[in-house]
Every structure is written in C-alpha cells, then in structure tokens.
Regions:
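Repeated loop/turn-to-beta-strand initiation elements of outer-membrane beta-barrel proteins
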Residues: 50-54, 98-103, 128-133, 170-175
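Hydrophobic, lipid-facing positions within transmembrane beta-strands of outer-membrane proteins
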Residues: 36-40, 86-90, 116-120, 155-161
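Transmembrane beta-barrel outer-membrane domains
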Residues: 31-35, 79-85, 111-115, 126-128, ...
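Solenoidal tandem-repeat scaffolds enriched in leucines and small polar residues
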Residues: 141-193
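Transmembrane beta-strands of outer-membrane beta-barrel pores
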Residues: 23-29, 58-62, 96-98, 107-111, ...
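Outer-membrane beta-barrel translocator domains and adjoining extracellular loop/strand segments
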Residues: 31-36, 55, 65-71, 113-121, ...
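Transmembrane beta-barrel domains of outer membrane proteins
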Residues: 43-45, 91-95, 123-125, 160-168, ...
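Short glycine/proline- and aromatic-enriched beta-strand/turn motifs that initiate or cap beta-hairpins
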Residues: 8-46, 50-53
Length: 193
C-alpha cells in the first residue's frame, strides 16, 4: 500500500504510521519449484501508549523437492508438492523507562500444518543508549496433519539473549545467543531417507 499524497503535498497518514505491500517470486529451472509470496505489513506508533505492528502473508508453493532417495531406486527422487500458507502476526510494544517490552502473537495455516506462536521480549538501553541488552522467549504450538495418521503435536521453545554496543557512528558490535528445544512430531513428510 502506498501513501496517498494530496494536492497540497502532505500525506493523509501521520508520520508515525507505515504500511506496505510486497510481492516475491522464486522460480527454479525446469519448473522444479515455484514460490509466490504476498505480504501486507503495517506499523503504528501511538506515543506514550506504545506501538503496534502487524503482518499478513500468503505464500503459494508448487513443484517438486528432492526426497533424499537415489535416482532410479524404489523410492521417488522427487516429491511433488503444492500448498498455500496464510499467516498473520501482531505485536504490541511499550516503553517502560529504559525497557522496551514487546508481546507478539502469530498464527499460520497450510494444508498439513498449523502454527500458533507467542513471543515475549525485553530490550534495556544503558550507557546513554549506546548499549542494549535484549532477552526473550518464543513458544510455538504446532499441529502437523500426517497422511493416514492422527494429527501430531509439535512444540518449540526458544530463549534468546544478546548485547549490542555502539562503538562509533559507523560501528556496532553485537553478540547473541539462542537456545531452542523441540518436542513432539519432528518428522519431515517430504523426506523418505
């Protein structure tokens, strides 16, 4: 979505809001894989009340993916696939002194997979805003729809922490650590080996 510019040269949207629409196309040779993606994103800053951002996505994938099997064997070398994924993400952030706390909710669905997510994070500014400490966690509650079987659950938990330091106007140094755990159905339906 593009900002509307009235005849007087101003914009109809406040400078604290931003919206955009994007399209991506990935196409491999021999029609092996084709991925089309549409994204609608927005961000609005409400001053002391915090800020809100969102994203809607629609991905379509078609083609064939290698299974890991040897060519000419009993198992097929390629697995044909066609799927559409729709997802939405919303996040609210609020500044509390030197802390910026954010909560993010997400949901996406495709033919054989549903994902529900919750993320919480905090960024602390120190040293006249030259140093930022960040930490947070991410929880995913997924459902995998397995052909000829009951739906399977998959859960993921990630914790991250990091620090960034402004050295000068052209240099920022950062270090980050992420630790993740997965539980439940972890199989890939497109691999046979």
């Amino acid at each position: 979505l593009l900002p509307v510019i009235p005849a007087n040269g101003g914009t109809l949207l406040p400078e604290t809001q931003r919206y955009d629409l994007s399209y991506q196309l990935y196409q491999e040779d021999d029609d092996r894989m084709r991925i089309e993606s549409w994204y609608v994103r927005g961000n609005a800053d409400f001053g002391d009340l915090g800020s809100f951002r969102f994203q809607y996505l629609n991905d379509a994938i078609s083609g064939a993916s290698p299974t890991g099997a040897l060519s000419g064997g009993v198992q097929p070398f390629y697995a044909e696939l066609e799927d559409v994924r729709e997802g939405i993400l919303g996040a609210y952030a609020h500044q509390f002194g030197d802390h910026r706390v954010e909560m993010e909710l997400s949901y996406s669905e495709e033919d054989d997979y549903i994902s529900r997510g919750l993320a919480l994070s905090d960024s602390i500014e120190l040293n006249d805003k030259n140093t930022t400490l960040s930490f947070g966690l991410n929880l995913l509650d997924d459902t995998v729809k397995v052909h000829l079987l009951d739906d399977k659950e998959k859960n993921s938990f990630d914790f991250f922490t990091g620090v960034s330091q402004i050295i000068d106007k052209n240099t920022v140094v950062s270090a980050n650590l992420t630790l993740g755990f997965n539980d439940g159905y972890l199989n890939d339906a497109y691999e046979v080996v």
